[in-house]
């Protein structure tokens, strides 16, 4: 249906068997985002997993203030959510926060509650999207395992939550 596609995940074996090729174009990292008033500036991969599993529920458990953690997720089919599910491996994410949205004739639809910069909030997004495209004000990225998500640390692979971004083409298509 198209000549070129983009993906934040590698091709599955069955997709390759259908004649698709993948070429790495760039790398991006999943940035962990918190409210700028949050005193936590670094989280371990283990603690991020525990937060999103629901085992750590208060910032004081990771060196912050005595405040409930509000862990936001991305919609199920988004690239950053797919990356987070991959990162979590066999550990399932806890049920996401949801909002009920009213859409005229469709009635009420439940949607995943995406990051809102409120006290206690934590979220994640591709670093480039957060810092380069949206330039969200009033939120801060934090380090993971002591490494801040810079272009250099992502490109070198030093930052621990990195994914290649792929160009997908059809074999033999010039």
Model-based region annotation:
Residues 1-174:
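Exported/periplasmic ABC-transporter solute-binding proteins
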């Amino acid at each position: 249906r198209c000549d070129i596609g983009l993906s934040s995940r590698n091709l599955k074996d069955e997709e390759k068997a259908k004649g698709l090729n993948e070429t790495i174009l760039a790398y991006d990292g999943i940035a962990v985002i918190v409210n700028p008033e949050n005193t936590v500036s670094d989280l371990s991969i283990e603690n991020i997993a525990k937060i999103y599993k629901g085992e750590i529920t208060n910032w004081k458990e990771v060196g912050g203030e005595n405040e409930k953690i509000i862990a936001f997720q991305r919609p199920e089919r988004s690239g950053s959510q797919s990356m987070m599910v991959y990162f979590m491996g066999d550990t399932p994410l806890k049920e996401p926060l949801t909002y009920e949205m009213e859409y005229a004739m469709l009635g009420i639809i439940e949607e995943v509650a995406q990051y809102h910069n409120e006290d206690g909030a934590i979220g994640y997004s591709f670093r480039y999207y957060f810092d380069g495209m949206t330039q969200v004000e009033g939120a801060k990225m934090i380090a993971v395992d002591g490494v801040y998500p810079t272009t250099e640390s992502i490109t070198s692979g030093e930052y621990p939550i990195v994914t290649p971004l792929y160009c997908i083409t059809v074999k033999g298509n010039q």
